[in-house]
């Protein structure tokens, strides 16, 4: 039986695979349940505000669950060449998340970001009744960062994209609403109690994930008018692609800061006193990661034996690093791939399935 896990782990399990929340791990190959009724039926362990959200806004909970899964898929993409590749296909994944290491910081940040991103996107698509497009009232004039269409004549300052020449319009992505729901559901169980360093670290990483979405939201603008007159100029806020969010958080993962708690347990300090305190966008961890080279039930390391590697690459995907110096073997395998693809009007791409033989390098 697994040891007690932090509340955030239980919540992630609930969001991603509610049918298996009692087992406290992410089940092998199980379908990820999207039905909010199933999620909330397993919500006995949720805090008051989470239970209220389940009861009052189950469709929002469904989007939060979709966003958490989006985050895990992005984690698997960004970590695909690392020794720990964010695989959720074993009980070991839950054991990894019980440690306050860099990898856990990334998982919590990317799932909080995914929850915010998914809810915000659902608002803009009209899929949630509780929200819609971003309200422009009381906001400063837009400063375009991306133009669609032909820019019009110069504005008051001599530039076609001068702020006074543009107005808010279109359907902007309401990141405020997405952040609010992500924060309400993902942060609710954490208590900033005395000595609870883990809660402080996880709350910080949650917020860093949401900030990665918000801070890379861009302003897109478009000119409207006959013959390129640009009689009307409108701008709206646009979410960044989630792949971009993942890439930004991976950069933060590489530069993550190790921290420790203050004596009263109410704040965090750099583990190395000579370093400056981490910023809001930084990821935090409190313990060193295992090397993930060999299987280890205690740490959740699945090891790298049998992993495909690149025999000629000097980076993380290379056999030297991925195989931890154990060497690798060559194996010839037969795979099926799409081939002879043709576009048929309109609008279908049809492909044949071809068998190809490839040489793979596999870790010993």
Curated annotation (Swiss-Prot):
Glycans are attached at residues 85, 310. The keyword Lipoprotein applies. Residues 1-23 form the signal peptide. A lipid is attached at residue 227 (O-palmitoleoyl serine). Gene3D superfamilies: 3.30.2460.20. Detected in ileum, colon and stomach (at protein level). Keywords: Developmental protein, Disulfide bond, Extracellular matrix, Glycoprotein, Lipoprotein, Secreted, Signal, Wnt signaling pathway. Disulfide bonds join 75-86, 123-131, 133-171, 221-235, 223-230, 293-324, 309-319, 323-363, 339-354, 341-351, 346-347. It is found in: Secreted, Extracellular space, Extracellular matrix. Its main location: secreted. GO terms for biological process: animal organ morphogenesis; axis specification; branching involved in ureteric bud morphogenesis; cell-cell signaling; epithelial-mesenchymal cell signaling; nephron tubule development; nephron tubule formation; odontogenesis of dentin-containing tooth. One of its GO terms (molecular function) is signaling receptor binding. Ligand for members of the frizzled family of seven transmembrane receptors. Probable developmental protein. May be a signaling molecule which affects the development of discrete regions of tissues. Is likely to signal over only few cell diameters. Interacts with PORCN. This is Protein Wnt-6. It comes from Mus musculus (Mouse).
